């Protein structure tokens, strides 16, 4: 049987290991780093986590993260309110914003359709998207979901759903590798994918 640390240190390692992208060894490294870090540094991390949990919420309009709703994008009158870019997660909004190529609005689904993980369309922020589309100002919806199986399934579902409207539905152009994530795409590739989007 593998040796485990006692009490608090093992609970801390386990907590870090539960985070996405952090395995057992990485979790152990972080835990021991914090154990040896100055108290101020550890307290700064604790305060940052507490502050995020207390202050950060989801925008009532688009579903992006914010401290006040509506979020800065939805509240900005200089943005193009006739275009909505649909993304999977808030981190995808930041990736697209870094391109400086897009000045429209966003809609965050909060995930993708994934029958293996029991995620159905009703579990996503789709009903609010349909409500937003009743606004006659919206002329185009860009489906900017990751080019993997789940993203493609969600794109297909939304395409069929939106085909019943007069709204132009487009998706990102090729350039993003199949199975890749928008989050990891460089700004140039993502900018070109936005500029070259095509009808669905």
Predicted feature residues:
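Conserved, well-folded catalytic cores of nucleic-acid-processing
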Residues: 15, 19, 37, 52-55, ...
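Catalytic cores of large soluble enzymes that bind and process phosphate-bearing ligands
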Residues: 4, 37, 41, 117-121, ...
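Solvent-exposed alpha-helical segments within well-ordered globular domains of core cellular machineries
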Residues: 10-14, 28-32, 43, 47, ...
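Cys/His-rich Zn2+-binding cysteine-cluster or related metal-binding knuckle/ribbon modules and their
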Residues: 2-9, 18, 31-93
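Long C-terminal interaction/binding lobes of large macromolecular proteins
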Residues: 130-200
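Extended interfacial segments that mediate partner engagement and assembly in macromolecular machines
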Residues: 27, 76-142
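Flexible, active-site-adjacent loop/turn segments at secondary-structure boundaries
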Residues: 17, 72, 91-94, 104-107, ...
């Amino acid at each position: 049987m593998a040796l485990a640390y006692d009490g608090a240190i093992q609970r801390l390692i386990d907590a870090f290991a539960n985070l996405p992208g952090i395995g057992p060894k990485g979790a152990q490294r972080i835990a021991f780093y914090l154990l040896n870090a100055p108290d101020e540094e550890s307290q700064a991390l604790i305060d940052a986590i507490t502050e995020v949990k207390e202050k950060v919420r989801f925008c009532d309009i688009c579903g992006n993260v914010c401290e006040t709703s509506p979020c800065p994008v939805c509240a900005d009158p200089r943005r193009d309110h006739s275009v909505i870019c649909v993304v999977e997660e808030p981190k995808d909004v930041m990736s697209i914003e870094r391109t400086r190529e897009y000045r429209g609005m966003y809609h965050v689904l909060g995930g993708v359709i994934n029958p293996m993980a029991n995620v159905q369309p009703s579990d996503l922020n789709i009903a609010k998207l349909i409500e937003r589309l009743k606004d006659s100002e919206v002329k185009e919806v860009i489906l900017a979901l990751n080019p993997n199986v789940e993203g493609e399934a969600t794109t297909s579902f939304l395409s069929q759903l939106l085909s019943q409207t007069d709204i132009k539905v487009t998706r990102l152009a090729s350039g993003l590798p199949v199975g890749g994530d928008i989050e990891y795409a460089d700004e140039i590739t993502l900018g070109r994918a936005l500029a070259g989007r095509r009808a669905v």
